[in-house]
Curated annotation (Swiss-Prot):
Principal EC category: hydrolase
Residues bound to Zn(2+) 2: 100, 135, 349
Active site: 69, 134
Gene symbol of the encoding locus: dapE
Pfam families documented for this protein: M20_dimer, Peptidase_M20
Similarity comment text for this entry: Belongs to the peptidase M20A family. DapE subfamily.
Biological processes annotated in GO: diaminopimelate biosynthetic process; L-arginine biosynthetic process; lysine biosynthetic process via diaminopimelate
Cofactor note: Binds 2 Zn(2+) or Co(2+) ions per subunit.
InterPro entries: ArgE/DapE_CS, Bact_exopeptidase_dim_dom, DapE_proteobac, Peptidase_M20, Peptidase_M20_dimer, Peptidase_M20A
PROSITE patterns reported in the protein's UniProt record: ARGE_DAPE_CPG2_2
Organism (species): Pseudoalteromonas atlantica (strain T6c / ATCC BAA-1087)
Protein name: Succinyl-diaminopimelate desuccinylase
Catalysed transformations (reactions): N-succinyl-(2S,6S)-2,6-diaminopimelate + H2O = (2S,6S)-2,6-diaminopimelate + succinate
This enzyme's EC code(s): 3.5.1.18
Cofactor names: Zn(2+); Co(2+)
Length: 376
């Protein structure tokens, strides 16, 4: 198992699938799954390649979800080894996507083969939902596949997303939920003028600063047992011509909420609008809703995952909702139980991204153990 998962991870890393490119990764996966009895369906939407593969027609349905695309490598000369040439060094496997998340994809394949070989007449169905649009704008990836599946009433019971959830040891953290995400792009209109004649101008920086201060100091909620309090962060502010003697005519800013299940996106929008309307300036906001918070608090999937990790590693796992968003936010609203479990995330998106080779073999065994507990 360890040799096979390593070889597959290397093959995937060597395919330069910078988002939204798939670079043949899904074809490799399809060729691996087809002999195991999977029906393969390619769903191409614009520049994005997706794969829905399924073995079985009945329920319950266990789905592995993941992505073949990776973020750009950055300057290749800053890497110790070429970013798109998988390289083994001192027990680690280096390459872009090693941890996020080609190692997980390889482990899913090997685990599935091992399980199906032992249990050819397993109950229910096993599925794979794979996209090349997770690291990009997430418009034509998982969300479009889910729309297609929902239209034909094809449901998942359980879904394991292979995002790198572990922090210091494989399986030490499992994501059983994620916060929601809401982005606002605001434009504040002023009147440009000379700094020596402020009475003839309207400075959008001065006009909006008190409002931004109030937004930053607002207590949105207290969180709950599963989620921290909702966070508001301004990520960008731009205004001015660059000249020291010109009052700017407008201001643009971007801010983001990461919110708990204690509030909704509509409630946040209403509260922001109420605060801004207290101040006398002209503004416009374009809202981008990135996903609702979701939580898989308990159930067979969480229990099977905790048990499999304990069996393979001997350790208890921590359930967490911390961190950014994932494609789990598109899957959870269908009613599926969703968790995320993958390699250590310390080097993801960084120069010299790498994964521990032994961890890959353990991850495959954990994945197989989850299948064993749910579908054997």
């Amino acid at each position: 198992m360890s040799c096979e998962v390593l070889a597959l991870t290397e093959e995937l890393i060597n395919r330069q699938s910078v988002t939204p490119e798939d670079a043949g990764c899904q074809q490799l996966m399809a060729e691996y799954l087809a002999p195991l009895g999977f029906d393969i369906e390619s769903m191409v939407f614009d520049d994005t390649t997706n794969m829905w593969a399924r073995k079985g027609t009945g329920g319950p349905v266990f789905c592995f979800a993941g992505h073949t695309d990776v973020v750009p490598s950055g300057p290749a000369e800053k890497w110790t080894f070429p970013p798109f040439t998988a390289t083994q060094h001192e027990g680690q496997l280096y390459g872009r996507g090693a941890a996020d998340m080609k190692g997980s994809l390889a482990a899913m394949l090997v685990a599935t083969k091992a399980f199906v070989t032992k249990h050819p007449e397993h109950s229910g169905s096993i599925a794979f939902l794979i996209t090349s649009d997770e690291e990009g704008p997430f418009i034509n990836g998982t969300t479009r596949v889910i729309d297609t599946l929902e239209a034909r009433n094809e449901k998942m019971t359980w879904c394991l997303v292979g995002e790198p959830s572990s922090t210091t040891l494989i399986g030490d953290v499992v994501k059983n939920g994620r916060r929601g995400s809401l982005t606002g792009d605001i434009t504040v209109k002023g009147v440009q003028g000379h700094v020596a004649y402020p009475h003839l101008a309207k400075n959008p920086i001065h006009l909006s600063a008190p409002a931004f201060a109030e937004l930053a100091q607002t207590h949105w909620d207290s969180g709950n047992a599963s989620f921290p309090p909702t966070s508001f962060q301004v990520s960008n502010i731009n205004s001015g011509t660059g000249a020291g003697n010109v009052i700017p005519g407008d201001l643009s800013a971007c801010f983001n909420f990461r919110f708990s299940t204690e509030v909704t996106d509509k409630q946040l929008i209403e509260r922001v609008t109420t605060i801004l309307d207290k101040y006398d300036f002209d503004y416009h906001i374009d809202w981008t809703f990135n996903g609702q918070p979701f939580l898989t608090d308990s159930g067979k999937l969480v229990e099977a995952t905790q048990s499999a990790i304990k069996d393979v590693t001997g350790r208890e796992t921590e359930l967490s909702t911390a961190g950014g968003t994932s494609d789990g936010r598109f899957i959870a609203p269908t009613g599926a139980q969703v968790i995320e479990l993958g390699p250590i995330n310390a080097t993801i998106h960084k120069i010299d991204e790498n994964v521990n080779i032994n961890d890959l073999a353990q991850l495959a065994k954990i994945y197989e153990g989850i299948l064993q507990r749910l579908l054997a």
